[in-house]
Amino acid sequence: MTVFTLLPLAVACGGDIGLPAATIANTVDTLVLSALNGTPIGPPSAIDLVTGTGSRPELGDDFDFAFDIDSTGTALLYPASRLGRGGSAALQVSSVPFDSIARAPVENFVVDTIMPLTAGKVLMLRSRFSSLLCSVFVGSLPRYAKAEVLELDGVGRTVTLKLMANLNCGYRDLMPGLPDQ
């Protein structure tokens, strides 16, 4: 077995898999995304969880999830894989309030589901695998985040998200401050 095969087991059990020390504190941010369609080119339409920023898929930027509004007016969050991009970005709906989520789970993430968004919905997000800020011994790992839909603007075709992305390689803690795990 390779390290990558054993890695999910080690993470699931809370084992120390030799992650580099966390260097980036978790903070809550507000992110406004414009719909992929029917909005001016320029504002971000997608989320890059590896960097914790909005991104612009039309420019070829890396991203994990993109926002759009369909012809019926339904706001949707698309994993990159559903828009012709590779990757393993995944999500799940959380019944736990945003501020009460302390740690991302390791299971029950869905890779290819287009998620309808409504105000107040809380999501757990997992990024694509990336080696950015990971040690050479660990390889590529996902980043984890939690998000809450604060506002949907059908006229302006935007969504406002409350977002906390843990930018440290493989860490799942989702509380403010420097993460332990």
Sequence positions of predicted segments:
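Sec-dependent bacterial lipoprotein signal peptides
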Residues: 1-12
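Surface-exposed, beta-sheet-biased, low-hydrophobicity segments with strongly acidic/polar composition
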Residues: 13-181
